UniProtKB/Swiss-Prot annotation:
InterPro entries: Cu-oxidase-like_N (IPR011707), Cu-oxidase_2nd (IPR001117), Cu-oxidase_C (IPR011706), Cu-oxidase_fam (IPR045087), Cupredoxin (IPR008972). The gene is LAC1. Its main location: secreted. Glycans are attached at residues 149, 242, 430, 503. This is Laccase-1. Cu cation 4 binds at residues 480, 544, 549. Residues 579-604 are annotated as: Disordered. It comes from Cryptococcus neoformans var. neoformans serotype D (strain B-3501A) (Filobasidiella neoformans). Its EC number is 1.10.3.2. Residues 592-604 have a biased composition (Low complexity). Residues 1-20 form the signal peptide. It catalyses: 4 hydroquinone + O2 = 4 benzosemiquinone + 2 H2O. Cu cation 3 binds at residues 164, 485, 543. The keyword Signal applies.
């Protein structure tokens, strides 16, 4: 490695902040040239949150314009085409307060549909803004635009946004979303002095479409039917690949990202896992980390040397920068959790944590060593909430009796599509998700229809009140991170094997202030019981957050208060996204332009031929 260039914390000039005036929200053409024109901007310094941001309980409107396009970038030293927002890689940081309204005008300059999901935000009363094509909206077409408009209600903490169209998230469409509140249990100035984001992703040298297409064949991707672990690990948009393995003469070794922190301070590190596959274990040489947040919930947690973060999860930890003097540097290490992924190989991503003060910033690389007690290959693959007790600082006990309990049996197996072809894929309750991308389930329920069909596993919570979601991970050797949209859940029980309605009453559940999350790692051959409050009408996705598994059908939905959905009024711009499309087409289908210009010519038969029956219904029935 080379000496590190001096990095300065610059403001993000690529986010377009505009006045809160009414705009035309109908989808319109913005571009018909989909080839990359620019080199993406990679600036890790934008992940240092400024203490000048005003934390207040006075609501305001924060308005952005996001231009999604292609660009060239070499985030790990290997140049490839990437997807960018406002030419930034990763995309812009959104920072707001509880009660603020966030408006994001999205212009899609790609040659495929797109959507944005606001991971962890409940979308209370704004189910139409959740951003899942085929579930809560039609995709934003190539050359089209759409405006997301929602209020952040009763939430604060660490979140993120990302594409929910196929697995194009893995090509670069993601960024942090931080919500502050003067009433949150963790207060800047009292509990910590400085605030930094650590945005972690796996990174592939091939576009996601290439990988998805290969995984749908018997040969798999590069001879392996299992999804890849990544060619590199990126931290705040930068990493280092093995240039020898790439065979590229232009590959180079960029300096690792640098996280500058004042000496003798308490620094909050917000770890966001935007990975498409691996669980990562994170440590900082010489610095114990006090866990203080899990998925937006402030917690009392342990002080540890290493934190495990699964895809979609977020954890905050506080470190004390009193292990040296101004200019000293320490390695932040991010390693693949080898016991959590079949066939994984050792891989480490590095960042520099450097102490700053009033003098010049040193460029010397760290000479520090890793903790001697870091997890090895044989360490069980458990989530942080399994390994330690994480107690929410705002105490909330779970109701003793649920109104309803629904089972979701999750497994890989043989499925058959409508053409009669068999393939190996993923599903819930014997159904592998088949996405009618231009006929959103939310719209179907709004019109009085039902999601109970052979295209998606669906369960309904008709009334307001507590309910159980029981996930049985029947894949004995495959672990999965499960993410639930529109809801925060309490983890009231875990165990090995599988639960059924017969033995559910025999479990001693944790009801006294259990941890609250929205993404949960469940080991193969294990179960978890999630307690929700069915208070947010909508059709909400429940899916594996390994992006490659999601594209192979690992998605189900819960329908909350369908009668209330029938009285919800959808925005006109939302309805216009589905104009001139084929509701029987299966996604991710493409349109050549905005629906105001040209109607979709994609038929379900054409699409099924294209993907060779990748998403199908499973043979047989095996309901809980």
């Amino acid at each position: 490695m080379r000496g590190l260039a001096k990095l300065f914390f610059l403001s993000c000039s690529f986010v377009s902040l505009v006045s809160s005036e009414k705009t035309d929200e109908s989808p319109t053409a913005v571009s018909d040239n989909y080839m990359p024109k620019a080199t993406a901007t990679i600036d890790p310094s934008v992940f240092a949150l400024s203490n000048d941001f005003e934390i207040t309980d006075v609501p305001t409107t924060r308005e952005y314009t996001f231009d999604i396009a292609k660009a060239f970038a070499s985030p790990d030293g290997y140049e490839r085409e990437v997807y960018v927002v406002n030419n930034m890689f990763p995309g812009p940081v959104i920072e707001a307060n509880t009660g603020d309204t966030i408006i994001v005008h999205v212009n899609n300059h790609l040659d495929e549909g797109q959507s944005l999901h606001w991971h962890g935000l409940r979308q209370l009363g704004t189910a139409f803004m959740d951003g899942v094509p085929g579930i809560t909206q039609c995709p934003i077409p190539p050359g089209g635009s759409f405006t997301y408009n929602f209020t952040v209600s009763h939430q604060s903490g660490t979140y993120w946004w990302h594409s929910h169209y196929s697995n194009s998230m893995a090509d670069g469409i993601w960024g942090p979303l931080i919500v502050h509140s003067p009433n949150e249990p963790l207060q800047r100035g009292r509990d910590y002095d400085e605030d930094r984001i650590v945005f972690i992703t796996d990174w592939m040298h091939d576009n996601s479409e290439i990988i998805i297409a290969a995984l749908a064949t018997p040969e798999g991707y590069k001879g392996n039917i299992a999804p890849p672990q990544g060619d590199a690990i990126l931290i705040n948009g930068r990493g280092q690949t093995n240039c020898t393995a790439t065979g590229s003469s232009s590959c180079f070794y960029p300096p690792p990202p640098e996280i500058q922190v004042p000496v003798n301070c308490r620094v909050r590190l917000r770890f966001i896992s935007a990975t498409a596959h691996p669980m990562y274990r994170i440590s900082i040489d010489n610095h114990p980390m006090e866990v203080v947040e899990a998925d937006g919930t402030a917690v009392y947690g342990p002080t540890v040397h290493e934190i495990s973060v699964a895809p979609g999860e977020r954890y905050s930890a506080i470190i004390n920068t009193n292990e040296g003097k101004e200019g000293d540097a320490f390695w932040l290490r991010t390693s693949v959790a080898l016991s959590c992924m079949f066939g994984a190989v050792s891989q480490e991503g590095l960042a520099v944590v450097r102490y700053t003060g009033n003098g010049m910033v040193s460029t010397e690389e760290p000479q520090t060593s890793a903790w001697s007690d870091l997890a090895g290959v044989t360490v069980p693959c458990t989530g942080l909430d399994q390994t330690y007790t994480l107690s929410p600082r705002d105490s909330l006990s779970a109701p003793r009796e649920p109104l309803q309990s629904h089972f979701f049996n999750s497994e890989r197996g043989a499925f058959v599509n409508v053409l009669g072809n068999t393939f190996q894929g993923y599903g819930f309750n014997n159904i592998s998700y088949q996405n009618q991308i231009f006929n959103p389930l939310l719209s179907i329920v709004q019109r009085g229809g039902s999601c109970e069909n052979t295209l998606v596993s669906s369960r309904t919570f008709p009334d307001f009140g507590p309910g159980n979601i029981i996930i049985n991970n029947l894949d004995t050797v495959i672990d999965h991170p499960y993410h639930l949209h529109g809801n925060e859940f309490q983890v009231i029980g875990r165990g090995t094997g599988a639960l059924s309605i017969d033995n559910l009453t025999n479990i001693d559940f944790t009801l006294d202030n259990p941890v609250r999350k929205d993404t949960l790692w469940i080991q193969g051959g294990s179960w978890a019981v999630l307690r929700i409050t069915a208070d947010n009408p909508g059709v909400w996705a429940l899916h594996c957050h390994i992006g490659w598994h999601l594209t192979e059908g690992k998605l189900a939905v819960i329908v909350v208060q369908p009668s209330a959905i029938g009285h919800m009024e959808s925005p006109e711009s939302w309805t216009n996204l589905c104009a001139n499309t084929d509701p029987n087409a299966f996604g991710p289908a493409k349109r050549s332009s905005s629906p105001s210009i040209q109607s979709s010519k994609t038929s379900s038969f054409q699409y099924l031929r294209e993907v060779k029956g990748k998403v199908v219904k499973r043979r047989g029935a095996r309901e809980a």
